[in-house]
Amino acid sequence: MITKGQVRLLRTYSYDSNLYTQGLEQLNNNHILLSAGRYGFSKVGVYDLTQEIFSEKIAFPDTVFAEGLTVVEDYFWLLTYKEGVAYKFDKAICNCLGAYPFEGDGWGLAYDKENQCLWMTSGNAFLQKRDPKDFALLDTVLVAIESVPISMLNELEYVDGYLYANIWQTNTIVKLQPDSGKVVATYDISPLLKALNLDKSHYPDLNVLNGIAHLDQQRFLITGKLYPLMLEVVLD
């Protein structure tokens, strides 16, 4: 049985509405590592929760569309959309440590510390299990709700044995078991977005919900592409 999870707003943060948010991950109590996409605008930087300011650390050439990212110990991985390359960066100073080829699109990425692997999405209904050292493909897992495949899996966050995933072009976040691909809960963010007037009538450039960063327990940060706010929520 699929649980319909509850979403509770704790607070909002002012956010840079020029950021086409792709990856979002906590670095420490006050700082969030994030990637922003689009050709000509792709970058990686750090968002300061105390000052509510984004600081750019890496700017990419116009030929690169940055996608999801995830931290693995003292380095982090960054996907590209159509370029077929995953970049490995030093976490402290953002030096590039290598570029690793992969097939297909790059969308979302999360590090599973318990099983020492990466989980990746490509916009379809499959998770890709990858080696966190060299990005080698280890396995693929079909994600489904009651045997119905769920496509357009996007940004990912791994928390206590589960993956939380944005579904592209929706306001839904799903919670799933990565090894089986079974969805165990869904979270509808639509009522919260409506209450905050996060819609096209108030913000014409607003794009889709995207970006999940785990803080602690059931607290998360969520945002979207070209969003003016980042939301701190509880996902029960």
Where are these regions (language model features)?
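Blade-loop segments of beta-propeller domains
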Residues: 52-81, 85-88, 94-108
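Short loop/turn segments that connect beta-strands within beta-propeller blades
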Residues: 47-52, 90-94, 131-135, 177-181, ...
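Beta-strand-rich domains and repeat architectures in extracellular enzymes and scaffolds
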Residues: 10-43, 58-70, 224-230
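Conserved beta-strand positions in repeat-built beta-propeller and related beta-rich domains
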Residues: 32-38, 76-83, 118-124, 165-169, ...
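A short helix->beta-strand "capping" segment at the edge of beta-propeller domains
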Residues: 1-18, 51-55, 199
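Beta-rich, blade/repeat-based domains predominating
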Residues: 17-28, 62-72, 102-114, 147-159, ...
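Hydrophobic, well-structured mid-protein blocks that either form specific transmembrane helices
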Residues: 86-146
